[in-house]
Structures are given as C-alpha cells and as structure tokens.
C-alpha cells in the first residue's frame, strides 16, 4: 500500500521545485519595475549618501526578523551597533545590558548583505548559526550550535496534548546530503556568477522555501532563512539590495506568511507557483517601501544642507542630530522641552526657547499645544 504523503519533501521529485513562468509574469514584471526604481535612485544618491539609509534598513531588518520570532530588541542598541560597523558617528552610544545577543544577529545580516560574492557554504551557514546562539542555549534549552540538527523537527502550536502540527521537517538522517544539494543549487543559480543563472527574484523566493522546508538547525532557521533571502536579493541587486528589508514586509503580514509557507510545504505536487507569486508581491511591496525611504533620504540630505547654513547653538545641534539619526517616524513621541533639556543638559526655559527658535527657522514642525507640544524635523513624512 502506498504511504500517505503529507509534506512536499516526501514527493519522489523533491527537491525539483517548479513554477508556471507565464502565470508569475505580471507579478515578476511589477517587482522588477519597483527594483529598477530603487537601483536608479540609489545610483543617483551614491553609496556614501546611502550609508545612513543602509544603517536604518539593517536596523529594521534586525528588529523585524527578531520580532517575527517573538523577540523584542532595543532599537537604540541595534542602531548604534550597526552604525559602528558602518563607520558612522554613534556619539558614544553604548550597547545596553541584556542586548549583547544583537551583535551576533548583526554579524549575520552584515555578512549576508555585504559579502554577496562569497559562495553560500555549510561552514558559512554554521557560522551564522553560531553567531545567533553564542551561549549554546536557546532560552533555557541547550542546542547543538553550528551544526546540523541530530533530532526530528516539528513546528507545532497549542497546549501539550492539544497541539497542532504545522510542519514536520525531513529526518536528520540524510539531512547533510539534502543541505548540500540546496547549497549546490543556490551557488549554481547565482544570477551573476552561477553556471546555471536564474532570474534573481524567483530564485530568492525558491531559496527561502527550500531552506525553511529543510529546517536544518535546532533553532534559528527563520532568521537564517530570511538572511538567505537578503543574500539572494543582494546577489541580484548589488549594494542597493541592502536597503530592501524583506523581514519588515514579512513581519507586517506574519500570519499570512506562515499560512502561505505551510500551504507550500503541504503541496501535493512540486508546483509552487502560488508561493512564488506571494513572495514576488512581498518583494514588490518591500521595494516600494524602500523607494519611499530613499526619497526621504534625499529630503534629509537637502535638509542637512539647509541646516548647515543656519547658525545653531551646540545644544540645538545635539538635538537636531538626535532627531535626524532616528530617521522618519523613528523618534517616538517627538522632541519635547523636557527631552531637549536632558539631551542638551540645560534649563527648562532655555530648552523651550531653543525649540521655538528651531521652529521659527523652519527646521522643526510643531504638533499639539501646551503640555502636548511635540516637535519633529520639518521633512515631509517624518512626523509620527
């Protein structure tokens, strides 16, 4: 009697994923158009002009790829750590206690987005895994770090005895062979250097599904799988790929992401067209967001040029830098007299006068009245 096939990897054709090239064409064309806009804008600004934007994008990627896993990181610590890696001014901002785990995650993201020419190897994957779990523990549980899992893996939800199995990964026996097949395919299909180059955005979609289906590590597969997404995107787009934050887009529709992933992994055939279509839509939306934030970066550059021609006190310069470093909508609650007082180490009356003057100079916009007064940079789209 033929055994019951539950997961896509149980099909005899696995891992030969296929898709309908004609059906995906409209979504692929839309994604490529959004991608082209980003490439054009990035070229206009130049790499130096993009540095701050790359910092903000990597910050978003780190925060959201962790949020998908239910882990909340401190935004200021993440931003400061990334700024240090990029050689940007951090004004001595420290990494706060309890946030040391962000360093490993940033190592992974930076390696994936910066070293796009390096082949993806088992050693590189294991190094990423080791960086994510430097203590050898995931929470209270000891795991095999920097090595493929040696135990069965299930994705479940619900209470013990009433749990639902969303997915069961391939057995650890033969897993090394399966991972090797994935890595060989990934490197051979590199759109620029591969012996069998493949359309970059479709390749990114397939690579994420394939890796998540293997689920080769005890923990951290989601974060590593999304790092592979960013690597594939960078190999397709070059440096501009560093500013498209797919984890932010996935986090915004997390439930649908897991639903689409589960549907693809339960497929009764190797046809994963629906998954590729869904991923192309997410890439389009992530690219459109990146395009808007590049526009914001251009506005910021122009704003800083205006600000450079205005005589500001050291106190005002400190506070304006704080606001600009936080990025669009990044300074939660806006600037208040009390916050400026603490930043500039000055008196309340002086702090109030400073902010009023910045508003009069056209550098800040005021929201609210009285105790509810908040100030934001006078850049379109920067206020909350």
Where are these regions (language model features)?
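FIC/Doc superfamily catalytic core
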Residues: 1-384
């Amino acid at each position: 009697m033929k055994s019951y096939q539950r997961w896509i990897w149980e099909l005899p054709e696995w891992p030969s994923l296929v898709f309908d090239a004609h059906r995906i064409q409209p979504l692929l064309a839309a994604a490529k158009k959004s991608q082209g806009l980003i490439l054009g804008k990035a070229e206009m600004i130049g790499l130096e002009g993009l540095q701050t934007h790359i910092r903000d994008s990597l910050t978003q990627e780190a925060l959201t790829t962790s949020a998908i896993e239910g882990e909340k990181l401190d935004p200021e610590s993440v931003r400061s750590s990334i700024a240090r890696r990029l050689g940007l001014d951090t004004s001595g901002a420290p990494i706060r206690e309890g946030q040391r785990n962000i360093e490993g995650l940033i190592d992974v993201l930076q390696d994936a987005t910066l070293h796009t020419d390096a082949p993806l190897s088992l050693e590189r994957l294991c190094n990423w895994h080791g960086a994510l779990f430097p203590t050898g523990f995931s929470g209270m549980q000891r795991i095999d770090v920097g090595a493929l899992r040696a135990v069965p893996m299930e994705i479940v939800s619900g209470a013990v005895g009433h749990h639902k199995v969303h997915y069961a990964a391939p057995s650890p026996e033969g897993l090394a062979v399966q991972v090797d097949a994935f890595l060989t395919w990934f490197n051979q299909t590199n759109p620029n250097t591969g012996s069998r180059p493949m359309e970059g955005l479709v390749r990114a979609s397939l690579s994420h599904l394939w890796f998540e289906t293997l689920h080769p590590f005890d923990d951290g597969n989601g974060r590593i799988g999304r790092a592979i997404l960013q690597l594939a995107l960078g190999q397709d787009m070059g440096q501009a790929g560093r500013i498209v934050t797919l984890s932010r887009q996935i986090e915004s529709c997390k439930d649908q992401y897991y639903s689409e992933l589960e549907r693809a992994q339960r497929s009764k055939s190797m046809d994963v067209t629906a998954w590729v279509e869904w991923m192309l839509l997410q890439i389009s939306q992530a690219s459109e967001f990146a395009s808007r934030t590049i526009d914001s970066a251009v506005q910021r550059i122009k704003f800083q040029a205006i600000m450079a021609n205005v005589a500001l006190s050291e106190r005002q310069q400190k506070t304006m830098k704080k606001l600009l470093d936080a990025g669009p909508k990044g300074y939660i609650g806006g600037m208040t007299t009390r916050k400026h007082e603490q930043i500039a180490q000055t008196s309340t009356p002086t702090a109030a006068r400073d902010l009023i003057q910045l508003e009069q100079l056209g550098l800040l916009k005021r929201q609210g009245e009285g105790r509810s007064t908040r100030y934001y940079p006078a850049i379109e789209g920067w206020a909350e």
